[in-house]
């Protein structure tokens, strides 16, 4: 058995904490964050809250669900340009920068297609 496993994975299996948890259970040492860190950071809203609590600057953001996805931007207090992204995904999959309302609503629907939490995050584009 190896002394340590060098983690060089990309995508959900390497980012969501499941492989790290398996290694933890098997007593296999590895590089990178532990399973809890990976799991927490996969959820962008949880990550934003951790940043805020610890004084790390982060743009304001809100989430939309499939029930609230058609709420007009002015009712949400957000204005273009915006970033739309799945709440729980990695590798920049489903992340869009939107300059028009058409791009925004298209991005919302596309981001829901790749999210597994029924939440999409919107933030000002900075």
Regions found by a protein language model. Give the residues of each.
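A conserved helix-loop-beta module that forms one wall/lid of the active-site cleft
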Residues: 20, 24-94
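Phosphate-binding site of ATP-dependent enzymes
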Residues: 99-126
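Short beta->alpha connector loops
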Residues: 11-13, 64-69, 126
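N-terminal glycine-rich "phosphate-gripper" loop used for MgATP/nucleotide binding
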Residues: 1-24
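Short catalytic-loop micro-motif centered on adjacent basic/acidic residues
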Residues: 5-8, 31-33, 60, 97, ...
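Short, amphipathic alpha-helical segments
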Residues: 13, 41-45, 98, 102
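Gly/Ser/Thr-rich beta-alpha loop segments that engage phosphate groups in nucleotides
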Residues: 13-16, 92, 96
């Amino acid at each position: 058995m190896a002394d340590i496993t060098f983690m060089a994975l990309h995508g959900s299996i390497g980012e969501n904490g499941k492989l790290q948890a398996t290694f933890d259970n098997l007593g296999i040492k590895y590089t990178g964050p532990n399973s809890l860190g990976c799991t927490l950071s996969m959820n962008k809203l949880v990550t934003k809250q951790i940043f805020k609590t610890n004084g790390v600057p982060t743009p304001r953001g809100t989430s939309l669900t499939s029930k609230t996805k058609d709420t007009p931007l002015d009712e949400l207090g957000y204005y273009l340009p915006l970033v739309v992204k799945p709440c729980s995904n990695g590798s920049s999959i489903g992340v869009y920068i939107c300059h028009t309302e058409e791009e925004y609503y298209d991005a919302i629907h596309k981001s829901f297609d790749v999210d597994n939490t029924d939440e999409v995050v919107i933030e000002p584009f900075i």
